[in-house]
Protein backbone atom coordinates (compact mmCIF):
# COMPACT_ATOMS: atom_id res chain seq x y z
CA UNK A 1 0.00 0.00 0.00
CA UNK A 2 3.03 2.25 -0.18
CA UNK A 3 3.26 2.90 3.54
CA UNK A 4 6.61 3.02 5.31
CA UNK A 5 7.63 0.29 7.73
CA UNK A 6 8.73 2.10 10.87
CA UNK A 7 11.16 1.29 13.66
CA UNK A 8 12.85 3.28 16.40
CA UNK A 9 16.47 3.04 17.49
CA UNK A 10 16.77 3.74 21.20
CA UNK A 11 20.14 4.18 22.88
CA UNK A 12 22.16 6.70 24.89
CA UNK A 13 22.78 10.12 23.27
CA UNK A 14 26.51 9.36 23.22
CA UNK A 15 25.81 6.20 21.22
CA UNK A 16 23.50 8.07 18.85
CA UNK A 17 26.33 10.46 17.99
CA UNK A 18 28.47 7.48 16.97
CA UNK A 19 25.71 5.18 15.74
CA UNK A 20 27.03 4.20 12.33
CA UNK A 21 30.51 3.46 13.67
CA UNK A 22 28.96 1.30 16.40
CA UNK A 23 26.97 -0.56 13.75
CA UNK A 24 30.11 -1.21 11.71
CA UNK A 25 31.95 -2.44 14.81
CA UNK A 26 29.02 -4.72 15.58
CA UNK A 27 29.16 -6.18 12.07
CA UNK A 28 32.83 -7.05 12.61
CA UNK A 29 31.68 -9.58 15.23
CA UNK A 30 30.33 -11.76 12.41
CA UNK A 31 32.62 -10.65 9.57
CA UNK A 32 35.95 -10.68 11.46
CA UNK A 33 35.28 -12.64 14.66
CA UNK A 34 38.91 -13.58 15.26
CA UNK A 35 39.85 -9.90 15.50
CA UNK A 36 37.18 -9.12 18.10
CA UNK A 37 38.90 -9.76 21.42
CA UNK A 38 37.03 -9.80 24.72
CA UNK A 39 38.50 -6.37 25.47
CA UNK A 40 37.03 -4.97 22.25
CA UNK A 41 33.64 -6.57 22.89
CA UNK A 42 33.44 -5.09 26.38
CA UNK A 43 33.44 -1.61 24.84
CA UNK A 44 30.46 -2.33 22.58
CA UNK A 45 26.75 -2.01 23.38
CA UNK A 46 24.57 -5.04 22.73
CA UNK A 47 22.21 -4.74 19.74
CA UNK A 48 18.67 -6.06 20.27
CA UNK A 49 15.82 -6.23 17.76
CA UNK A 50 12.48 -6.07 19.60
CA UNK A 51 9.51 -6.94 17.37
CA UNK A 52 5.83 -6.84 18.25
CA UNK A 53 2.48 -8.09 16.89
CA UNK A 54 3.49 -9.90 13.70
CA UNK A 55 -0.07 -11.23 13.82
CA UNK A 56 -2.21 -8.13 13.57
CA UNK A 57 -5.00 -9.28 15.87
CA UNK A 58 -2.48 -10.07 18.62
CA UNK A 59 -2.47 -6.37 19.31
CA UNK A 60 -1.23 -5.96 22.88
CA UNK A 61 2.41 -6.15 21.79
CA UNK A 62 2.17 -2.89 19.87
CA UNK A 63 0.78 -1.04 22.89
CA UNK A 64 3.58 -2.51 25.04
CA UNK A 65 6.14 -1.28 22.50
CA UNK A 66 4.77 2.27 22.75
CA UNK A 67 4.95 2.10 26.56
CA UNK A 68 8.53 0.84 26.34
CA UNK A 69 9.48 3.69 24.00
CA UNK A 70 7.98 6.23 26.39
CA UNK A 71 9.68 4.64 29.41
CA UNK A 72 13.11 4.71 27.77
CA UNK A 73 12.74 8.18 26.24
CA UNK A 74 11.17 9.95 29.21
CA UNK A 75 12.67 7.99 32.09
CA UNK A 76 15.62 9.22 34.12
CA UNK A 77 17.97 7.76 36.68
CA UNK A 78 20.73 5.18 36.90
CA UNK A 79 18.63 2.24 35.67
CA UNK A 80 17.61 4.02 32.46
CA UNK A 81 21.15 5.26 31.85
CA UNK A 82 22.51 1.75 32.32
CA UNK A 83 20.08 0.39 29.73
CA UNK A 84 20.77 3.14 27.20
CA UNK A 85 24.57 3.02 27.53
CA UNK A 86 24.80 -0.75 27.21
CA UNK A 87 22.24 -1.45 24.50
CA UNK A 88 21.09 -0.31 21.08
CA UNK A 89 17.41 -1.26 20.94
CA UNK A 90 15.76 -1.54 17.52
CA UNK A 91 12.05 -1.37 18.37
CA UNK A 92 9.56 -2.37 15.67
CA UNK A 93 6.12 -1.75 17.21
CA UNK A 94 4.13 -3.22 14.30
CA UNK A 95 5.56 -6.17 12.41
CA UNK A 96 2.22 -6.37 10.54
CA UNK A 97 0.62 -2.92 10.08
CA UNK A 98 -2.03 -4.05 7.57
CA UNK A 99 -3.26 -6.93 9.73
CA UNK A 100 -3.36 -4.70 12.78
CA UNK A 101 -5.40 -2.11 10.87
CA UNK A 102 -7.99 -4.73 9.93
CA UNK A 103 -8.26 -5.85 13.55
CA UNK A 104 -8.39 -2.36 15.08
CA UNK A 105 -10.93 -1.11 12.53
CA UNK A 106 -13.18 -4.09 13.24
CA UNK A 107 -13.05 -3.75 17.03
CA UNK A 108 -13.49 0.02 17.04
CA UNK A 109 -16.27 -0.15 14.48
CA UNK A 110 -18.25 -2.85 16.28
CA UNK A 111 -17.81 -2.19 19.99
CA UNK A 112 -20.40 -0.58 22.20
CA UNK A 113 -20.10 2.18 24.77
CA UNK A 114 -20.14 -0.46 27.51
CA UNK A 115 -17.43 -3.15 27.13
CA UNK A 116 -18.72 -6.70 26.75
CA UNK A 117 -17.10 -10.04 27.47
CA UNK A 118 -19.75 -11.95 25.50
CA UNK A 119 -17.92 -14.00 22.87
CA UNK A 120 -21.03 -13.89 20.67
CA UNK A 121 -20.82 -10.11 20.40
CA UNK A 122 -19.73 -8.68 17.01
CA UNK A 123 -16.70 -7.05 18.63
CA UNK A 124 -15.31 -10.54 19.32
CA UNK A 125 -16.10 -12.03 15.91
CA UNK A 126 -13.96 -10.71 13.10
CA UNK A 127 -14.98 -11.94 9.66
CA UNK A 128 -12.46 -13.52 7.30
CA UNK A 129 -9.60 -12.73 6.71
CA UNK A 130 -9.26 -11.36 10.26
CA UNK A 131 -6.07 -9.59 11.28
CA UNK A 132 -3.54 -12.41 11.49
CA UNK A 133 -2.14 -12.07 7.99
CA UNK A 134 -0.83 -9.13 6.01
CA UNK A 135 -2.50 -7.41 3.03
CA UNK A 136 -1.70 -10.40 0.80
CA UNK A 137 -3.12 -12.83 3.39
CA UNK A 138 0.32 -14.28 4.20
CA UNK A 139 1.38 -15.28 7.70
CA UNK A 140 4.42 -13.06 8.21
CA UNK A 141 5.66 -15.22 11.09
CA UNK A 142 6.40 -18.00 8.62
CA UNK A 143 8.14 -15.71 6.15
CA UNK A 144 11.51 -14.90 7.74
CA UNK A 145 13.04 -17.70 5.65
CA UNK A 146 11.34 -17.52 2.20
CA UNK A 147 11.00 -13.70 2.35
CA UNK A 148 8.06 -13.51 -0.05
CA UNK A 149 6.39 -10.39 1.40
CA UNK A 150 7.43 -6.71 1.36
CA UNK A 151 7.32 -6.51 5.18
CA UNK A 152 9.65 -9.50 5.44
CA UNK A 153 12.01 -8.10 2.83
CA UNK A 154 12.41 -4.89 4.81
CA UNK A 155 12.68 -6.72 8.13
CA UNK A 156 15.35 -9.20 7.01
CA UNK A 157 17.29 -6.35 5.40
CA UNK A 158 17.18 -4.42 8.68
CA UNK A 159 18.23 -7.51 10.65
CA UNK A 160 21.34 -8.01 8.51
CA UNK A 161 22.06 -4.29 8.42
CA UNK A 162 22.58 -4.45 12.20
CA UNK A 163 23.13 -8.18 12.98
CA UNK A 164 21.69 -8.04 16.51
CA UNK A 165 22.63 -10.36 19.34
CA UNK A 166 18.98 -10.70 20.41
CA UNK A 167 15.63 -10.97 18.61
CA UNK A 168 12.31 -10.71 20.45
CA UNK A 169 9.00 -11.85 18.92
CA UNK A 170 5.91 -10.81 20.93
CA UNK A 171 2.61 -12.68 20.39
CA UNK A 172 -0.75 -13.56 21.92
CA UNK A 173 -2.47 -16.93 22.44
CA UNK A 174 -5.79 -18.30 23.71
CA UNK A 175 -7.61 -16.43 26.49
CA UNK A 176 -7.55 -19.44 28.85
CA UNK A 177 -3.73 -19.50 28.91
CA UNK A 178 -1.48 -17.33 31.08
CA UNK A 179 1.90 -16.06 29.84
CA UNK A 180 4.55 -18.06 28.01
CA UNK A 181 8.20 -17.20 27.55
CA UNK A 182 10.99 -19.33 26.15
CA UNK A 183 12.74 -21.70 26.51
CA UNK A 184 10.27 -24.02 24.83
CA UNK A 185 10.16 -27.81 24.81
CA UNK A 186 13.76 -29.08 25.12
CA UNK A 187 13.43 -31.90 22.61
CA UNK A 188 12.01 -29.68 19.85
CA UNK A 189 14.99 -27.56 18.83
CA UNK A 190 16.64 -27.49 15.41
CA UNK A 191 19.94 -29.42 15.71
CA UNK A 192 21.78 -26.60 13.89
CA UNK A 193 21.18 -24.28 16.87
CA UNK A 194 24.27 -24.33 19.13
CA UNK A 195 23.88 -25.42 22.74
CA UNK A 196 25.49 -22.17 23.89
CA UNK A 197 22.58 -20.21 22.44
CA UNK A 198 20.10 -22.48 24.20
CA UNK A 199 21.99 -21.95 27.45
CA UNK A 200 21.64 -18.17 27.08
CA UNK A 201 17.89 -18.61 26.67
CA UNK A 202 17.80 -20.33 30.06
CA UNK A 203 19.90 -17.57 31.60
CA UNK A 204 17.44 -14.94 30.35
CA UNK A 205 14.29 -16.65 31.62
CA UNK A 206 14.66 -15.59 35.30
CA UNK A 207 14.65 -11.94 34.22
CA UNK A 208 11.27 -12.36 32.51
CA UNK A 209 9.97 -14.24 35.55
CA UNK A 210 11.08 -11.56 38.01
CA UNK A 211 9.22 -8.77 36.23
CA UNK A 212 6.04 -10.88 36.05
CA UNK A 213 6.46 -11.91 39.70
CA UNK A 214 6.61 -8.22 40.60
CA UNK A 215 3.03 -7.76 39.35
CA UNK A 216 1.87 -11.23 40.52
CA UNK A 217 1.10 -12.46 36.98
CA UNK A 218 1.03 -16.17 36.21
CA UNK A 219 3.39 -17.59 33.60
CA UNK A 220 4.98 -20.81 32.38
CA UNK A 221 7.88 -22.00 30.26
CA UNK A 222 9.33 -25.18 28.62
CA UNK A 223 5.87 -26.74 28.13
CA UNK A 224 4.87 -25.68 24.60
CA UNK A 225 6.11 -24.29 21.27
CA UNK A 226 9.11 -25.55 19.28
CA UNK A 227 12.25 -24.12 17.71
CA UNK A 228 12.56 -26.21 14.55
CA UNK A 229 11.67 -23.84 11.72
CA UNK A 230 14.02 -20.90 11.13
CA UNK A 231 11.32 -18.94 9.30
CA UNK A 232 9.72 -17.70 12.54
CA UNK A 233 10.81 -14.55 14.35
CA UNK A 234 11.72 -16.37 17.54
CA UNK A 235 13.99 -18.86 15.73
CA UNK A 236 15.47 -16.79 12.89
CA UNK A 237 18.00 -15.23 15.25
CA UNK A 238 19.07 -18.64 16.56
CA UNK A 239 20.83 -19.48 13.31
CA UNK A 240 22.62 -16.12 13.09
CA UNK A 241 24.51 -16.07 16.36
CA UNK A 242 21.63 -14.27 18.06
CA UNK A 243 19.19 -15.54 20.66
CA UNK A 244 15.55 -15.54 19.61
CA UNK A 245 12.83 -15.33 22.25
CA UNK A 246 9.07 -15.86 21.95
CA UNK A 247 6.53 -14.21 24.25
CA UNK A 248 2.88 -15.37 24.24
CA UNK A 249 0.22 -13.51 26.25
CA UNK A 250 -3.34 -14.74 26.79
CA UNK A 251 -5.44 -12.61 24.45
CA UNK A 252 -8.60 -10.64 25.16
CA UNK A 253 -8.97 -10.09 21.36
CA UNK A 254 -10.92 -6.94 22.27
CA UNK A 255 -11.21 -4.65 25.31
CA UNK A 256 -12.18 -7.58 27.51
CA UNK A 257 -13.30 -11.19 27.26
CA UNK A 258 -14.40 -14.19 29.31
CA UNK A 259 -11.88 -16.86 30.21
CA UNK A 260 -11.83 -19.86 32.54
CA UNK A 261 -10.04 -17.60 35.03
CA UNK A 262 -12.63 -14.84 34.86
CA UNK A 263 -12.61 -11.56 32.96
CA UNK A 264 -9.47 -10.83 30.94
CA UNK A 265 -8.88 -7.21 29.92
CA UNK A 266 -6.79 -5.72 27.14
CA UNK A 267 -5.07 -3.47 29.68
CA UNK A 268 -3.95 -6.54 31.66
CA UNK A 269 -2.50 -8.07 28.48
CA UNK A 270 -0.60 -4.90 27.63
CA UNK A 271 0.82 -4.68 31.16
CA UNK A 272 2.14 -8.24 31.04
CA UNK A 273 3.77 -7.69 27.64
CA UNK A 274 5.37 -4.48 28.83
CA UNK A 275 6.73 -5.99 32.04
CA UNK A 276 8.09 -9.11 30.33
CA UNK A 277 9.81 -6.93 27.73
CA UNK A 278 11.38 -4.87 30.52
CA UNK A 279 12.61 -8.19 31.91
CA UNK A 280 14.23 -8.94 28.56
CA UNK A 281 16.01 -5.59 28.61
CA UNK A 282 17.15 -6.22 32.20
CA UNK A 283 18.64 -9.54 31.15
CA UNK A 284 20.39 -8.10 28.11
CA UNK A 285 22.11 -5.46 30.22
CA UNK A 286 23.20 -8.02 32.82
CA UNK A 287 24.37 -10.59 30.24
CA UNK A 288 25.71 -8.18 27.61
CA UNK A 289 29.23 -9.58 27.49
CA UNK A 290 27.99 -13.16 27.27
CA UNK A 291 25.74 -12.33 24.31
CA UNK A 292 28.50 -10.48 22.45
CA UNK A 293 31.00 -13.29 23.06
CA UNK A 294 28.48 -15.90 22.00
CA UNK A 295 27.91 -14.24 18.64
CA UNK A 296 31.67 -13.81 18.15
CA UNK A 297 32.28 -17.49 18.92
CA UNK A 298 29.34 -18.57 16.72
CA UNK A 299 31.05 -17.11 13.66
CA UNK A 300 34.61 -17.87 14.74
CA UNK A 301 33.70 -21.58 14.69
CA UNK A 302 32.17 -21.49 11.18
CA UNK A 303 35.11 -23.20 9.46
CA UNK A 304 35.26 -25.86 12.16
CA UNK A 305 31.53 -26.53 11.79
CA UNK A 306 31.86 -26.68 7.99
CA UNK A 307 34.76 -29.14 8.21
CA UNK A 308 32.54 -31.62 10.08
CA UNK A 309 29.86 -31.44 7.40
CA UNK A 310 30.16 -34.18 4.75
CA UNK A 311 28.56 -31.81 2.26
CA UNK A 312 31.16 -29.29 1.06
CA UNK A 313 28.85 -27.34 -1.21
CA UNK A 314 25.56 -27.23 -3.06
CA UNK A 315 25.18 -26.92 -6.81
CA UNK A 316 22.01 -25.35 -8.22
CA UNK A 317 21.16 -26.28 -11.81
CA UNK A 318 20.28 -23.20 -13.91
CA UNK A 319 19.27 -25.20 -16.98
CA UNK A 320 16.10 -26.53 -15.38
CA UNK A 321 13.43 -24.18 -14.00
CA UNK A 322 15.93 -21.36 -14.50
CA UNK A 323 13.80 -18.52 -13.16
CA UNK A 324 12.92 -20.42 -10.00
CA UNK A 325 16.57 -21.37 -9.51
CA UNK A 326 17.59 -17.73 -9.79
CA UNK A 327 14.82 -16.73 -7.37
CA UNK A 328 16.15 -19.29 -4.87
CA UNK A 329 19.65 -17.84 -5.16
CA UNK A 330 18.25 -14.33 -4.71
CA UNK A 331 16.48 -15.50 -1.54
CA UNK A 332 19.68 -17.05 -0.18
CA UNK A 333 21.54 -13.81 -0.85
CA UNK A 334 19.03 -11.94 1.32
CA UNK A 335 20.39 -14.06 4.20
CA UNK A 336 24.04 -13.19 3.43
CA UNK A 337 24.81 -16.49 1.71
CA UNK A 338 27.86 -16.35 -0.59
CA UNK A 339 27.19 -17.83 -4.06
CA UNK A 340 29.58 -18.31 -6.98
CA UNK A 341 29.66 -18.96 -10.70
CA UNK A 342 31.28 -22.16 -11.87
CA UNK A 343 34.91 -21.60 -12.84
CA UNK A 344 35.12 -24.80 -14.87
CA UNK A 345 33.08 -27.89 -15.66
CA UNK A 346 32.05 -30.23 -12.88
CA UNK A 347 30.42 -33.67 -13.04
CA UNK A 348 28.02 -34.78 -10.30
CA UNK A 349 26.07 -38.03 -10.38
CA UNK A 350 26.91 -38.49 -14.06
CA UNK A 351 25.71 -35.02 -15.04
CA UNK A 352 28.19 -32.53 -16.46
CA UNK A 353 27.74 -28.84 -15.70
CA UNK A 354 29.76 -26.32 -17.70
CA UNK A 355 30.48 -22.74 -16.71
CA UNK A 356 27.19 -20.84 -16.77
CA UNK A 357 25.09 -23.97 -16.27
CA UNK A 358 24.98 -23.80 -12.48
CA UNK A 359 25.67 -21.83 -9.35
CA UNK A 360 27.73 -23.26 -6.51
CA UNK A 361 27.41 -22.52 -2.79
CA UNK A 362 30.36 -23.59 -0.62
CA UNK A 363 29.47 -24.60 2.93
CA UNK A 364 32.75 -23.24 4.31
CA UNK A 365 31.59 -19.65 4.84
CA UNK A 366 30.32 -17.58 7.80
CA UNK A 367 26.70 -18.66 7.23
CA UNK A 368 27.55 -22.37 7.21
CA UNK A 369 24.98 -23.25 9.89
CA UNK A 370 22.27 -21.37 8.05
CA UNK A 371 23.14 -23.15 4.79
CA UNK A 372 22.81 -26.51 6.52
CA UNK A 373 19.56 -25.42 8.13
CA UNK A 374 17.85 -24.55 4.85
CA UNK A 375 19.50 -26.87 2.30
CA UNK A 376 19.78 -30.25 4.01
CA UNK A 377 17.01 -32.85 3.97
CA UNK A 378 16.19 -33.85 7.54
CA UNK A 379 13.71 -36.69 7.98
CA UNK A 380 14.39 -37.85 11.54
CA UNK A 381 14.21 -35.86 14.76
CA UNK A 382 14.63 -36.54 18.44
CA UNK A 383 11.01 -35.41 18.86
CA UNK A 384 8.74 -35.73 15.83
CA UNK A 385 5.98 -33.46 17.16
CA UNK A 386 5.82 -30.08 15.43
CA UNK A 387 3.93 -26.89 16.25
CA UNK A 388 3.13 -26.54 12.54
CA UNK A 389 5.88 -26.23 9.89
CA UNK A 390 7.61 -29.60 9.52
CA UNK A 391 9.64 -29.12 6.30
CA UNK A 392 11.82 -26.20 5.24
CA UNK A 393 14.35 -27.34 2.63
CA UNK A 394 14.35 -24.28 0.37
CA UNK A 395 15.39 -25.91 -2.95
CA UNK A 396 12.46 -28.31 -2.61
CA UNK A 397 10.12 -25.41 -1.85
CA UNK A 398 11.29 -23.64 -5.02
CA UNK A 399 11.10 -26.84 -7.06
CA UNK A 400 14.64 -26.61 -8.41
CA UNK A 401 17.25 -29.18 -9.37
CA UNK A 402 20.16 -29.18 -6.90
CA UNK A 403 23.00 -31.46 -5.84
CA UNK A 404 25.20 -32.01 -2.82
CA UNK A 405 28.90 -31.53 -3.55
CA UNK A 406 30.98 -33.93 -1.45
CA UNK A 407 34.41 -32.79 -2.70
CA UNK A 408 36.02 -29.48 -1.74
CA UNK A 409 34.61 -27.01 -4.29
CA UNK A 410 37.49 -24.48 -4.18
CA UNK A 411 38.81 -25.43 -7.62
CA UNK A 412 35.38 -24.90 -9.17
CA UNK A 413 34.59 -21.52 -7.61
CA UNK A 414 34.45 -18.72 -10.16
CA UNK A 415 33.51 -15.12 -9.50
CA UNK A 416 31.30 -14.37 -6.52
CA UNK A 417 27.80 -13.24 -7.51
CA UNK A 418 26.86 -10.30 -5.33
CA UNK A 419 23.41 -9.69 -6.79
CA UNK A 420 21.85 -12.19 -9.16
CA UNK A 421 19.51 -10.89 -11.85
CA UNK A 422 16.57 -12.83 -13.20
CA UNK A 423 17.21 -13.46 -16.92
CA UNK A 424 14.97 -12.02 -19.58
CA UNK A 425 13.28 -14.18 -22.18
CA UNK A 426 14.05 -14.36 -25.89
CA UNK A 427 12.12 -13.21 -28.94
CA UNK A 428 13.19 -15.71 -31.59
CA UNK A 429 12.65 -14.93 -35.26
CA UNK A 430 12.02 -11.20 -34.99
CA UNK A 431 8.61 -9.73 -35.79
CA UNK A 432 5.97 -12.36 -36.47
CA UNK A 433 4.07 -12.33 -39.75
CA UNK A 434 1.08 -14.30 -38.44
CA UNK A 435 1.34 -15.10 -34.73
CA UNK A 436 3.68 -15.44 -31.77
CA UNK A 437 4.14 -18.72 -29.90
CA UNK A 438 4.74 -18.74 -26.13
CA UNK A 439 5.82 -22.16 -24.72
CA UNK A 440 4.34 -22.76 -21.27
CA UNK A 441 7.63 -23.52 -19.50
CA UNK A 442 8.66 -20.37 -17.64
CA UNK A 443 7.79 -19.19 -14.14
CA UNK A 444 6.18 -15.93 -15.25
CA UNK A 445 4.09 -17.37 -18.11
CA UNK A 446 0.85 -16.74 -16.17
CA UNK A 447 1.82 -13.10 -15.64
CA UNK A 448 2.51 -12.67 -19.36
CA UNK A 449 -0.74 -14.36 -20.29
CA UNK A 450 -2.67 -12.03 -17.99
CA UNK A 451 -1.05 -9.01 -19.65
CA UNK A 452 -1.86 -10.40 -23.09
CA UNK A 453 -5.52 -10.83 -22.15
CA UNK A 454 -5.61 -7.43 -20.46
CA UNK A 455 -4.39 -5.82 -23.70
CA UNK A 456 -7.46 -7.12 -25.52
CA UNK A 457 -5.77 -10.01 -27.32
CA UNK A 458 -7.63 -13.33 -27.44
CA UNK A 459 -4.92 -16.03 -27.51
CA UNK A 460 -5.38 -19.71 -28.35
CA UNK A 461 -4.21 -22.79 -26.46
CA UNK A 462 -2.68 -25.75 -28.30
CA UNK A 463 -3.98 -29.14 -27.18
CA UNK A 464 -1.36 -31.33 -28.86
CA UNK A 465 2.38 -31.18 -29.67
CA UNK A 466 3.23 -29.61 -33.04
CA UNK A 467 6.07 -28.25 -35.16
CA UNK A 468 6.37 -24.81 -36.74
CA UNK A 469 8.86 -22.96 -38.94
CA UNK A 470 10.51 -20.17 -36.96
CA UNK A 471 13.22 -18.06 -38.58
CA UNK A 472 13.75 -20.71 -41.24
CA UNK A 473 14.11 -23.51 -38.69
CA UNK A 474 11.62 -26.23 -37.76
CA UNK A 475 10.99 -26.14 -33.99
CA UNK A 476 9.03 -28.53 -31.78
CA UNK A 477 6.40 -27.16 -29.38
CA UNK A 478 4.68 -28.98 -26.54
CA UNK A 479 1.01 -29.22 -25.73
CA UNK A 480 -0.05 -26.09 -23.83
CA UNK A 481 1.84 -23.59 -26.01
CA UNK A 482 0.02 -20.24 -26.24
CA UNK A 483 -0.69 -18.83 -29.72
CA UNK A 484 -0.90 -15.03 -29.84
CA UNK A 485 -2.40 -13.89 -33.18
CA UNK A 486 -1.34 -10.61 -34.77
CA UNK A 487 -4.81 -9.91 -36.13
CA UNK A 488 -7.79 -10.29 -33.80
CA UNK A 489 -10.95 -11.95 -35.07
CA UNK A 490 -13.08 -9.90 -32.68
CA UNK A 491 -14.74 -7.16 -34.76
CA UNK A 492 -14.64 -4.82 -31.75
CA UNK A 493 -10.92 -5.26 -31.16
CA UNK A 494 -8.85 -2.08 -31.26
CA UNK A 495 -5.38 -3.58 -30.88
CA UNK A 496 -3.24 -3.40 -34.01
CA UNK A 497 -0.43 -5.73 -35.16
CA UNK A 498 2.14 -3.06 -34.25
CA UNK A 499 0.71 -2.96 -30.73
CA UNK A 500 1.04 -6.76 -30.50
CA UNK A 501 4.67 -6.53 -31.67
CA UNK A 502 5.41 -3.88 -29.04
CA UNK A 503 3.76 -5.91 -26.27
CA UNK A 504 5.74 -9.06 -27.14
CA UNK A 505 9.02 -7.13 -27.09
CA UNK A 506 8.07 -5.78 -23.67
CA UNK A 507 7.02 -9.14 -22.20
CA UNK A 508 10.25 -10.97 -23.04
CA UNK A 509 12.21 -8.32 -21.15
CA UNK A 510 9.93 -7.83 -18.14
CA UNK A 511 8.33 -11.23 -17.53
CA UNK A 512 11.24 -13.58 -18.35
Where are these regions (language model features)?
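Carboxylate/His-rich catalytic cores and anion/metal-binding grooves
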Residues: 69, 86-109, 114
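Short, active-site-adjacent cap segments at secondary-structure transitions
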Residues: 99, 175-176
Amino acid sequence: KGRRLIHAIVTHPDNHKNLDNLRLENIKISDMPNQMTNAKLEKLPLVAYLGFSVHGDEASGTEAAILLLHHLAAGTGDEINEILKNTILIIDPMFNPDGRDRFVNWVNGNRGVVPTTDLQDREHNQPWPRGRTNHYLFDLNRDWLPVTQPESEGRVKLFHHWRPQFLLDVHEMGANSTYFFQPGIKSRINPNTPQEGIDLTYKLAPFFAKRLDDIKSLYYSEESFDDFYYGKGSTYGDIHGSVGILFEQASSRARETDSNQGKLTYAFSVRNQYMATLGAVDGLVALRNEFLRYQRNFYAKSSEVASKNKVKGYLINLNKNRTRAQMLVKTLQRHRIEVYDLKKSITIKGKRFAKGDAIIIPTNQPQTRFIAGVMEKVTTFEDSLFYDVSAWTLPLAFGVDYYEVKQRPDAFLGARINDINIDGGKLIGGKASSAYLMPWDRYYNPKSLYRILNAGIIPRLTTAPFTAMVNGQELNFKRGTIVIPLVQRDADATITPNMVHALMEKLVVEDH
